[in-house]
A protein has these predicted regions:
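Flexible "stalk/tail and boundary" regions
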Residues: 1-18, 23-26, 33-95, 99-100, ...
Length: 162
């Protein structure tokens, strides 16, 4: 792990896309998202139920490793470590992206996210979410309303005072 933060190039998932699921449970991962995954090595994503609602969370291997490492910062055998491991690491499914850019959503994850015949992919920076489209539409409208008037501060670029 001896890389500096600035040397690690993480995926940046951005945008919102809706795709239909076929009879076999396959759905095309948006091309913009596929482009963010490493070109060398296995083309996989890790998908698990969101701890914050009915969406699914998804990420590449690097982000999943960061989450696992972060969970290991809790005291071993603590309630926090146990709960986070059970709800994220143990619940995650390693999903291979086929040659046509599709993933197969396991039935239990489809049920968890209340998905029927289409999904909305939502970029979240280093990870993305998979939603039932109507649930995401409602969530996004509420989030936009709550965020009105809020501001944020950008992190400074490394090595520069801003």
């Amino acid at each position: 792990l001896g890389k500096l933060k600035s040397e690690i190039l993480m995926a940046l998932f951005a945008g919102t896309f809706e795709n239909r699921i076929d009879r076999k449970g396959r759905v095309s991962l948006p091309a913009d998202f596929r482009a963010e995954l490493p070109a060398d090595g296995p083309r996989v994503v890790y998908i698990y139920p969101s701890p914050r609602g009915t969406a699914l969370e998804a990420c590449g291997r690097d982000f999943m490793q960061r989450m696992s490492d972060s969970i290991e910062q809790f005291d071993i055998f603590s309630d926090e470590e146990d709960e986070m491991t059970a709800s994220i690491v143990a619940a995650a499914r390693r999903i291979t992206i086929d040659t046509e850019g599709r993933i197969v959503l396991p039935p239990e994850l489809i049920t968890d996210a209340e998905i029927v015949d289409a999904v909305t992919f939502v970029g979240r920076g280093g990870r993305f979410q998979i939603w039932n489209p109507s649930d995401y539409f409602n969530y996004a409208a509420e989030a936009r309303e709550r965020s009105k008037g809020r501001t944020m501060r950008l992190l400074p670029l490394e090595g520069r005072d801003e």
